[in-house]
UniProtKB/Swiss-Prot annotation:
Homodimer. It is an enzyme of class 6 (ligase). Belongs to the class-I aminoacyl-tRNA synthetase family. A motif ('KMSKS' region) lies at residues 197-201. Its main location: cytoplasm. Its EC number is 6.1.1.2. The gene is trpS. InterPro entries: aa-tRNA-synth_I_CS, aa-tRNA-synth_Ic, Rossmann-like_a/b/a_fold, Trp-tRNA-ligase, Trp-tRNA-ligase_bac-type, Trp-tRNA_synthetase. It comes from Buchnera aphidicola subsp. Baizongia pistaciae (strain Bp). The lineage of its organism: Bacteria, Pseudomonadati, Pseudomonadota, Gammaproteobacteria, Enterobacterales. It catalyses: tRNA(Trp) + L-tryptophan + ATP = L-tryptophyl-tRNA(Trp) + AMP + diphosphate + H(+). CDD domains: TrpRS_core. HAMAP family: Trp_tRNA_synth_B. L-tryptophan binds at residue 137. This is Tryptophan--tRNA ligase. GO terms for molecular function: ATP binding; tryptophan-tRNA ligase activity.
Length: 333
């Protein structure tokens, strides 16, 4: 089947292990989209520099992400898988867009305000200008669609505002991308505190299932997952009064590719313990297959580096054309 004439861009930072929430909300969507669109899937190592880490850890983390991409089902023949820092046009466009962005816009970003409040004495400029680099990432590939979670909605609005402003100042240069909201990924919640999103930075690891977790640890985490005190227990989806069980129903529906209503009908009378056993079986089955593939790819670093090298060359070919168009619009040589 021929691909649609549309470009997709998305990225993941090489910072910490990915979770089943990342898989459901991000990677699973990518796998489906690669068959129908021209997809640019970036490993955003420049973004990760806002947090200090050793160079050895960063390099290993990059290769971990490539192996994760492949193990989840991304095909380097169907998608452009590349490293952000290897395509220098990202940094150059970042500066050009910085000159079209207002300070007030950046300090209003919710993520920046949250991080500044938590660590007010150690805020670097990179954290403030993070959304502008994100804009250069997206706009550099004539992007039509950006799959995002709810937490990136404000950044996407800023990216579109920057693109429109540039077009008004210098002529029609950038496409205005549309975001594709991931309902599921934004709604995979912590197992231990289902009022919060499942996050790889959660201090309570019992609330998070990492893709590389030991399988016995996965079983334990799900067994300990918060439910409710209904008597008799009922497997029913209700985000207001049964948030813990609703989270487990959501997870199971994603891994089984079934409607939530189907899950409710089949398991309505199950005990919470028995329902958790069903969830455990489904996740462990997925993770067993994933981890076998992951470790097979991860031990072949030459192959992973080759994918990055070839993908970065392909990305650079697209990026050079767009950057030339931008510079011509601005009167730069």
């Amino acid at each position: 089947m021929e691909k649609l004439n549309k470009n997709v861009f998305s990225a993941v930072q090489p910072s910490g292990q990915l979770t089943i929430g990342n898989y459901i909300g991000v990677l699973r969507e990518w796998i489906l989209m690669q068959h129908d669109f021209t997809c640019f899937f970036c490993i955003a190592d420049l973004h990760s520099l806002t947090v200090r880490r050793s160079s050895a850890i960063l390099k290993n983390s990059v290769l971990d992400v490539v192996a994760t991409y492949l193990a989840c089902g991304l095909d380097p023949c169907k998608s452009v898988i590349f490293l952000q820092s290897c395509v220098h046009e990202h940094s150059e466009l970042h500066w050009l867009l910085t000159c079209c962005t207002y300070y007030g816009e950046l300090i209003r970003m919710t993520q920046f305000k949250d991080k500044a409040r938590k660590n007010s004495k150690n805020i670097n400029v990179g954290l403030l200008s993070y959304p502008i680099l994100m804009a250069s990432d997206v706009l550099l590939y004539d992007t039509d669609v950006v799959p995002i979670g709810l937490d990136q909605k404000q950044h996407m609005e800023l990216i579109c505002n920057i693109a429109r402003r540039f077009n008004l100042l210098y002529g029609n240069t950038f496409k205005i991308p549309k975001n594709k909201m991931s309902y599921y990924g934004s709604n995979i919640l912590s197992l231990s505190d289902p009022t919060k999103k499942m996050s790889k930075s959660d201090v309570n690891e019992n609330g998070v299932i990492f893709l590389l977790d030991n399988l016995s640890s996965v079983k334990k985490k799900i067994k300990l997952a918060v439910t409710d005190s209904d008597n008799p227990p009922r497997i029913r989806y209700d985000k207001d009064t049964k948030i813990g069980i609703s989270n487990l129903i959501n997870i199971l529906s994603c891994f089984q590719n079934r409607d939530i209503s189907d899950i409710e009908k089949e398991f309505y009378y199950y005990s919470y313990q028995d329902f958790k056993s069903v969830v455990i079986k489904e996740i462990v089955n997925f993770m067993t297959n994933f981890q076998n593939l992951y470790f097979s790819f991860r031990k072949n670093e030459d192959y992973l580096e080759k994918i990055l090298s070839e993908g970065s060359k392909r990305a650079s070919w697209y990026a050079k054309k767009l950057l030339k168009k931008v510079k011509t619009s601005m009167g730069l040589f």
